[in-house]
From Swiss-Prot:
Single annotated GO MF: toxin activity
Gene that encodes it: SO5
GO CC, any one term: host cell presynaptic membrane
Propeptide span(s): 23-42
Protein name from the UniProt record: Omega-conotoxin-like SO-5
Pfam families named in the record: Conotoxin (PF02950)
Disulfide-bond pairs as recorded: C46-C61, C53-C64, C60-C71
Superkingdom assignment: Eukaryota
Function of the protein: Omega-conotoxins act at presynaptic membranes, they bind and block voltage-gated calcium channels (Cav).
Residues spanning the signal sequence: 1-22
Family the UniProt entry places it in: Belongs to the conotoxin O1 superfamily.
Keywords, ordered alphabetically: Calcium channel impairing toxin, Disulfide bond, Ion channel impairing toxin, Knottin, Neurotoxin, Presynaptic neurotoxin, Secreted, Signal, Toxin, Voltage-gated calcium channel impairing toxin
Source organism: Conus striatus (Striated cone)
Length: 77
C-alpha cells in the first residue's frame, strides 16, 4: 500500500513537471522543421553519372563504382 502511494505521487509529480515545462517552452522553438517541398528537393540532390564520388558528402543518383570512383546509374530493367 505504501509503495503504491509513493508510485502515484511520483507519477503525479513527473506529469506536473512535464506540463509546466511544456507551457514555458511554447513558441520558443528556434529551428523549425523544413517544409515538405524543401525536404524533397534536398533528398533528391545527388550526383549525376560520370561524376567523381571518392570522398564527397553528396551521394550518387545510382551507385559509386569502387575502382573508378565514378557515379554510375542503375541499369534499367
Amino acid at each position: 500500500m505504501k509503495l503504491t502511494c509513493v508510485m502515484i505521487v511520483a507519477v503525479l509529480l513527473l506529469t506536473a513537471c512535464q506540463l509546466i515545462t511544456a507551457d514555458d517552452s511554447r513558441g520558443t522553438q528556434k529551428h523549425r522543421s523544413l517544409r515538405s517541398t524543401t525536404k524533397v528537393s534536398k533528398s533528391t540532390s545527388c550526383m549525376e553519372a560520370g561524376s567523381y564520388c571518392g570522398s564527397t558528402t553528396r551521394i550518387c543518383c545510382g551507385y559509386c563504382a569502387y575502382f573508378g570512383k565514378k557515379c554510375i546509374d542503375y541499369p534499367s530493367n
